[in-house]
Amino acid sequence: MKKIFRLILMLIILWNIVQINIFSQEKTKKYNKIIPLTLNGDEMLLSLITDKSRLVALSGKIKKGKCPDELYNKTLKFEKVENNVELVIDLEPDLVLIMDWMGKDKISQLEDAGIDTFVYKTSRTYEEQHKLFRELAELVDEQEQGKKILKDMDERLEKLQKQIKEKSKDKASPRILLYSPIEETEGIGTLYDDMIKLIYGQNLAAELGLKGTGKISKEKVIDINPEIILIPVWGMHEKKGTDKLLNILLKDKSFEEVKAVKEKKVYIVAHKYQTITSQYLIDAIEMLGKEVYQLED
């Protein structure tokens, strides 16, 4: 009987030690009052931070109707700072995420207030986004959650690429042009260019030597004769109400000999997917792959 009692007592002591260690680990995280000032900062931290009490506020850039409801609903319980540096300082965070293009003045204000800042650049490739996410996971002590999310991204990319290879076996890479309603496209050094490479396509704007975002004339579109045209639409996360825009291009007489128009391979895509720099980049790549190769879900 005494042996059983001692065993039970030892188990209780061990359980308490484990709980104390877990509690201690949570309390010793370097940053526990975090605020992101960007859309992608909101997106990354909402998925990365397991204990949401460590998020003091969000940037407020995730808007209803411009993203899936599931993502928007995750933001409802948080205060939104909306680029108000004074409000950020009043909330007394110990870490603020801010992008380099937001300006040295804002960064200096935060640092002068004794707040640590994580200043980062816009990712231009899948690998750069991968690296950024790893660094952020390390910074906020969420390495395991970070590994889990990155593993999911890599597995989904591998699966998509396998589907594409199977469907396009023995076929040349599709010649693709992003062509906005204001005659803009994306060339060398853009995230979109890297996404097209990842789905084994040819970005015609890059092949023309265009760097970054730039204009492309209707005459040039006709001249390069793309096999697939992608039309980006602002604020769209679903394909509702886009038929009118599609028909404008399909019924344009000057485009009637363009291969993409003749074969009705003109597709509407959400503009957000050109510039998405969070773990949701994989959603954008999947969307592009499914549109370009007409893959089933």
Annotate each PLM feature.
Residues 1-6:
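Positively charged n-region of N-terminal signal peptides that target proteins for export
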Residues 28-33, 106-180, 184, 205-206, ...:
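Extracytoplasmic substrate-binding proteins
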Residues 8-19:
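Bacterial N-terminal signal peptides
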Residues 85-92, 113, 215-225:
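Short helices/loops that flank or line small-molecule/ion binding pockets
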Residues 33-91, 95-101, 201-204:
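A short, structured surface patch at a secondary-structure boundary
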Residues 59-62, 191-213, 268:
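His/Asp/Glu-enriched short active-site or ligand-binding loop at hydrolase and phosphoryl-transfer sites
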Residues 38, 100, 228, 232-236, ...:
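Short secondary-structure boundary segments
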